[in-house]
């Protein structure tokens, strides 16, 4: 038997956590599946000396602003990771780390989707793909009828 939930968010970065925030505010059941850890791309795909490319005063997620004594400075990548992880904790985001999505299919009931993962399948009414701006998308064949 597949787990059933209203919404599955794929990816626990800025976009996925922001979606989680707004779904939670509306009392909508959801889960975030993340192949690595919260903010994984900031952890594993940036060089050690990387700094955020926008001034500190611009760093904000819904209901959560980056606190700094230098609003015009540029925060190091490690601080961004901490900020994202603290945000996930503060909004009590329902993140499942270490869950790799292997397929997304329309389920036998055409109004739902089946998210296949390395730890089982989740049936959902809605799926939000928040895997990052440089992710190579694979568009499922059924998407033309959605």
Predicted regions and their residues:
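Conserved Rossmann-like nucleotide-cofactor binding loop
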Residues: 15, 37-38, 134
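Alpha-helical scaffold elements within enzyme catalytic domains, especially in hydrolases
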Residues: 22, 86-87
């Amino acid at each position: 038997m597949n787990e059933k939930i209203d919404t599955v968010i794929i990816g626990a970065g800025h976009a996925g956590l922001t979606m989680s925030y707004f779904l939670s505010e509306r009392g909508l059941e959801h889960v975030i599946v993340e192949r690595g850890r919260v903010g994984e791309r900031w952890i594993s795909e940036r060089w050690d000396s990387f700094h955020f490319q926008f001034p500190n005063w611009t760093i904000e997620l819904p209901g959560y602003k980056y606190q700094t004594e230098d609003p015009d400075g540029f925060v190091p990548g490690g601080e961004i990771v901490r900020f994202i992880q603290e945000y996930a904790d503060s909004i009590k985001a329902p993140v499942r780390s270490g869950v790799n999505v292997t397929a997304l299919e329309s389920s036998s009931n055409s109004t739902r989707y089946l998210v296949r993962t390395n730890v089982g399948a989740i049936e959902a009414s809605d799926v939000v793909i928040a895997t990052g701006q440089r992710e190579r998308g694979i568009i499922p064949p059924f998407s033309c009828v959605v």
